[in-house]
Design a protein with these regions (language model features):
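Conserved nucleotide-sugar phosphate-binding/catalytic loop shared by glycosyltransferases and other
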Residues: 6-9, 14, 32-87, 91-93
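A short, glycine/small-residue-rich beta-strand->loop->alpha-helix junction that serves as a flexible
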Residues: 14-27, 50-51, 231-232
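Donor-nucleotide binding loops and adjacent catalytic segments primarily
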Residues: 30, 184, 199-296, 348
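Short N-terminal targeting/anchoring amphipathic segment
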Residues: 96-118
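A nucleotide-sugar donor-handling region in carbohydrate enzymes
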Residues: 139-233, 259-262
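A donor-sugar binding/catalytic signature common to diverse glycosyltransferases
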Residues: 286-330
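C-terminal amphipathic helix plus adjacent low-complexity
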Residues: 354-406
């Protein structure tokens, strides 16, 4: 037997098959937890190829497992290794379980996918549950349309796992805005495990953004596509608005995203080079700093982007994607009903005049703070309190805490 580990430990599994959202959310949660408890260490397991591009606080570290990408048709493929996908998935599952056995976490948090990618955390959950380790599932505010999510979860046999393998379910949002499990046959025993934490606030990065990332002296609009893997239509739409010669109130800073195809990035950079009031970068790990200095935002409306809009109280136009999931559309629609953002639907035609009008209206639309919603950004406070209760709780009983907004 090796030497016993010291201090409190939390292990986080970050689902990583597409984009940046899961990693950025897990990183933000890890930082909030260690900032609140000097005796706590957090280890993140992820297959993201760019996890090393992010800064991590003291007592937060990561293990990168072999990467797997989920294609738009729903199939999986490896990111770089020329190994059979099934072999990669088996390797990932083995690394995850061995890490949990060695790290001996006091709490295990799973992000978004209850059983992990293709069930890769099921054995780890079963092992830790048998050891008495609290297991927590973290869900974003919206998953997908019930008509799509229900058969997916039935196929994956998720509902029994929620009952048998998890002690608690955190929903990173407010019930009055979105219920991620609405329309699903969720038993009362699972509903009792759910805690709505409120959204996760974001703060300016401690590291400064590169000076050449913000070339404008005047206020600018930040345009971001998240990871960028499917953001080309939004970037094209915005660029056409600036190429039209119409008068627009502010210049635009485009963040294309690290997963946008290289050929597409090159084409966009060529178009940007011909415009005086548009600048483009591929990626900046300090996106919070760029947003904090912006007058407003145009984005696709992923979870992290929405949290940033609320946190920095920025006017925003959301252009949600509707494939392969309706998640962004559902979030943007609900937020627009409350006046937190405005939404511009992608009708497939993407008329230039529609984007011109949206950019002109952006500086005068209401700010998110003008909509008063108790508990809206209480996410980290709720998570910290729940975590502390679990770490202090030796009886195995579920700690009770008022849900954000109640």
């Amino acid at each position: 037997m090796g030497e016993p580990l010291h201090g409190k430990r939390i292990l986080i599994y970050s689902h990583d098959s597409f984009g940046l959202g899961h990693l950025r959310r897990c990183r933000a949660i890890a930082h909030a937890l260690v900032d609140n408890d000097k005796e706590l260490s957090v280890l993140i397991i992820s297959g993201s190829p760019i996890i090393g591009s992010f800064d991590f606080r003291s007592r937060v570290d990561f293990i990168r497992i072999p990467g797997v990408i989920k294609l738009r048709n729903g199939e999986y493929t490896t990111q770089s290794l020329r190994i059979d996908t099934e072999q990669i998935l088996a390797m990932r599952a083995s690394i995850i379980q061995h890490t949990a056995e060695t790290f001996e976490p006091d709490i295990f948090i799973v992000d978004k996918e209850p059983l992990g990618l293709r069930g890769e955390v099921r054995d780890t959950l079963t092992m830790l549950k048998a050891r008495g380790t609290p297991t927590i599932l973290g869900l974003r505010d919206v998953m997908d349309e019930p008509a799509l999510l229900a058969p997916e979860w039935e196929r994956k046999n998720v509902l029994p796992a929620l009952d048998d393998l998890y002690d608690e379910i955190w929903v990173y949002g407010l019930r009055q805005i979105c219920d991620p499990l609405a329309g699903l046959p969720i038993p009362a025993s699972v509903r009792r495990k759910m805690t709505y934490t409120g959204y996760l606030p974001r703060f300016p990065s401690k590291g400064a953004a590169p000076t050449d990332a913000i070339p404008f002296e005047e206020p600018y609009i930040l345009v971001t596509t998240g990871g960028g893997g499917d953001g080309d239509t939004l970037i094209d739409w915005v660029l056409r608005a600036y190429e039209s010669g119409e008068s627009l109130p502010h210049p635009a800073l485009l963040v294309l995203g690290p997963f946008m195809q290289a050929e597409m990035q090159a084409e966009f950079h060529q178009r940007v080079a011909r415009l005086d009031r548009v600048h483009a970068i591929t990626f900046d790990a300090h996106i919070e700093t760029l947003l904090s200095r912006a007058v407003g935002m145009v984005a696709m409306g992923g979870y992290n982007t929405f949290c940033e809009i609320l946190s920095f109280d920025k006017r925003a136009v959301i252009v949600p994607r509707t494939r392969p999931r309706m998640e962004q559309f559902m979030r943007a629609s609900a937020a627009a009903r409350y006046g937190l953002v405005s939404m511009l639907e992608d009708d497939g035609w993407r008329e230039t005049s529609q984007m011109v009008e949206a950019l002109r209206k952006l500086p005068t639309q209401p700010m998110p703070s003008q909509c008063v919603m108790p508990g809206l950004l209480d996410g980290f406070g709720t998570i910290r309190r729940q975590t502390s209760l679990w770490l202090q709780n030796d009886s195995g009983d579920r700690p009770r805490l008022a849900t954000a907004g109640e």
